[in-house]
Amino acid sequence: MKAARWHGVKDIRVEEVAEPVPAAGEVKIKVAWTGICGSDLHEYLAGPIFVPVEKNHPLSHDKAPITMGHEFCGTVTELGDGVTGLAVGDPVAIEPIFACGTCPACHEGKYNLCDSLGFVGLSGGHGGFAAFSVVPARMVHKMPDGLSMEQGALVEPAAVALHAVRLSKIRAGDTAAVFGAGPIGLLVVEALRVAGAAQIHVVEPSEVRRQKALDLGASTAIDPMSTDAVAAIRQATGGVHVAFEVTGVPRVLPQCIEATRHEGQTLIVSIWESDASFQPNTVVLKERQLQGTIAYRNVYPAVMELMTQGHFSAEKLVTKRIAIDDIAGEGFEALVAEKSHVKILVKAPE
């Protein structure tokens, strides 16, 4: 079968690989759609970050080259021995976290903080940029009736956003800022609306993405290339209760902090390619808080329920659909060159 595999920086190859077979406790899926994620783009431009290269990942037991793709959905085609609660033909979304189940974080149920954290399609395993995938049954979530396959491919990134907002201290009626209106930033805007934020101020240089943010319910969308974003946010709010950093751009982190009020909170959502710095006194003198957030835990059912209510709409977020053979040029390179894109979905080969 065809699969898109990471061999190195700017080296994604579509090649033939063996079709996977499910072992006991595993599920085989005919992939439908897979989204290209910001994390995939980081691996393409500056990897390896999550991709194991020197030695096999302790849970996937794989190393590069690996089949990419972790934002995916499809249809169950085969069940390994012992799998219950699923049936052939079920439409499913995949929660792609590798977790050991034995470290202190896993014992607390915080499997996204596992000492050996990994992701199908980043750390090995049968990623979604392929015709078929095989994953452990615990990663498989049956989709509600009426949810489209394109919508299913957005469950994973929407889970990132919803987890970040849940982890924050935002309360109904509070104010928020979102720095960066890529796919995750826009999904954070939607999650903030669900949480009852009274004002949501988005900072984003792309005009198309700013308009998307407004369409999704942002109060304002600020162009940082022509406006002092921090000053504008502080003028409107006196400082927001919570700011979300969703750019991975070093100079933006201190802006997020300075956009918050006293005792404000900054959530760092991005995966970073380089170091960032800030003046600690900006945190100390206002008793502000910094909070990291990674992936999600126990939120897939909530995300899919919200989708049935019209939230996290694929129609509003997907800007391009491509074939797997075009993944490098029309997918990764397009995301680098054209900041008007939000979410690009890759259709699985037959």
Predicted regions and their residues:
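Glycine-centered, small-residue-biased loops immediately flanking beta-strands
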Residues: 174, 264-265
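Adenosine-nucleotide cofactor-binding segment
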Residues: 175-181, 193-255
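C-terminal hydrophobic helical "lid"/dimerization subdomain
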Residues: 250, 254-258, 297-350
